[in-house]
Amino acid sequence: MKKSIVFPGQGSQYLGMGKHLYDNFSVSKRIFDEVDDALNIKLTEIIFGEDAEKLNLTENTQPAIMAVSIATMEALKKEKGLNINNFSFCAGHSLGEYSALVAANSIKLADAAKILKKRGQAMQNAVPIGLGAMAAILNIQVEDLEKFITANKFLSIEVSNDNCPGQCVVSGKKDEINKLTILIKNELKKKAIPLPVSAPFHCKMMTPAADELNNFLKQFEINNPEIPIVSNVSVIPENDSNEIKKLLISCVHNRVRWREIVEFFFNNNIIECIECGPGKALTNMFKRFEFEIKCVKIDNIDDLKNYG
């Protein structure tokens, strides 16, 4: 049976995520401790604390989700004998791609934590707060949404996430996003939900962040992954470290093509995916496809015990 392992992205975080792992599995605790040491901050205190606003700062959110995802994977290895080499492919939603690269031994855990903190800072600082925005658009196909954006001459707006059938996210200037959401509701009678983010991710407004990340990445070693990584940008299995590095930079200001990644899995006979990390966003997305790929979420100790 062909399987893939997938890792969630931003929006999956919640206070206390991974605490059960930290308390019950020494292999998981080591992951959290190593990330704390790499960042020279007590990220665990933020994750396990009570200040949601602090956790939701992008520079904290990104390494936090990665840490919990890898801690989850390590617990699966220890308790269930999970072997990464038994998976045909590995993928992650946006920042989740870094979790995938750590899982595939392409990037060191400590390096991924440092890169993600910098990535979060660069993405936050690329656009002044209040200038950009994002919105989820539901029950519309991506091609129809793109035509509507073009027809109404919203020059700053791009489809930034193509998540699954009937679920897209747009990014752009805040005033244009506000106008678009009103038109979507009034003219197309579709749902348009403004997202609680402080920057317009995965669009051309993030180009300064991509440039900054490009310079920062030069100091880190990225190796060829042990299993192919299906890129958010290319939607093909990537094995070459130089190409992976280029795609990580491109991902910052390009669309997350998650719907196409799931379709790639189906076309390559993947029967089951494991979502390894906080929440169940990816598992829920899998359910929206006409074809069936079983997706099993591993987010808490009960999920862990019941797996396999």
Label for each model-derived stretch:
Residues 2-144, 272-301:
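FabD-like malonyl-/acyl-CoA
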Residues 10-12, 39, 104-253:
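Alpha/beta catalytic cores of group-transfer enzymes, especially the acyltransferase/condensing modules
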Residues 61-63, 200, 255:
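Glycine-rich phosphate/pyrophosphate-binding beta-alpha loops
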Residues 88, 155, 190, 271-272:
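Short acidic/polar active-site loop segments enriched in Thr and Asp
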Residues 185, 266-269:
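Non-catalytic positions within long, well-ordered alpha-helices that form the structural scaffold/packing
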Residues 195-197, 266, 299-300:
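Short glycine-rich catalytic loops that host catalytic nucleophiles or stabilize transition states
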Residues 256-264:
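A short, well-structured juxtamembrane/interface segment
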Residues 303-308:
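Short, charged, surface-exposed secondary-structure boundary motifs
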